[in-house]
Amino acid sequence: LVGSEMCIRDRNFLIRGSKDIEERFIGNAFMFNEKERAKILKNPTGKYNHKELTKPFYDKVKDKDDVTKMQYIDINFWLIGDILLKADKMSMAHSLEVRVPFLDKEVFNVARTLPTKYKVNKSNTKYAMRKAANQYLPDMVAEKKKLGFPVPIRIWLKDEKYYNMIKKAFTSEAANKYFNTDELVKYLDEHKEGKADNSRKIWTVYM
C-alpha cells in the first residue's frame, strides 16, 4: 500500500513537472480533483480553472524566471490568504503575540533584489541566508534542515475518539446540506482502516 501511494505521488510529480509553471504551480495544493469534488459536493461548482485566478499575477512577472514567479504567487496567495491568516487566528485564540522577523520590510526589500542563484540552488535552499548565518552561528544551526510545525493528523484520525468526532460532523444536518455525506464517511473509513492516507482531504473538509 505504501509503495503504491509513493508510485502515485511520483507519477503526479512527473506529470506536474512536464507542465508550464503557470499551469502547475498553485495546483500543487489542490486537495480534490474535479471528479472527487463532483462526488462529494451536492452542488458542484463546475469546472474550475485556477489559471484564470493566477493569470493577472503571472502576467506581472512574465519576464522573470520560474523561481521568482512561484515566489510571487506564494506571496500574493499562500502567504496572505493561508499561512499568515491561520497563524494570526490561532495565536490570537490562545492570547499569543506571534512575530515574523523575515517579513520585516527591510529584510524583504533586500531579499527581493537577490538573484535567484543566491536564493536556492541544486544543493541548498535559502543559500544567501545560510551563508550569512555561517558567519555567526555553528554549522549545525546554519545548515539545519528546514522544519515546519506539523501535527500528526494522519495518526489522530485513526484514533476512535477523533474518528467519531469527525464522523459526527460529516453526517450532521449541516454537512448534509452541502455534501454527499456517504462519500465523506468513505474517505474517513478508508483512512481509519489504513486503505489510503486521506488525512489532508478529511481535514480540509472538516475545517
Question: Can you name each region flagged by the protein language model?
Answer:
Residues 10-207:
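Adenosyl-5′-phosphate
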Residues 1-8:
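Short, small-residue-biased leader/transition segments that mark boundaries at the very start
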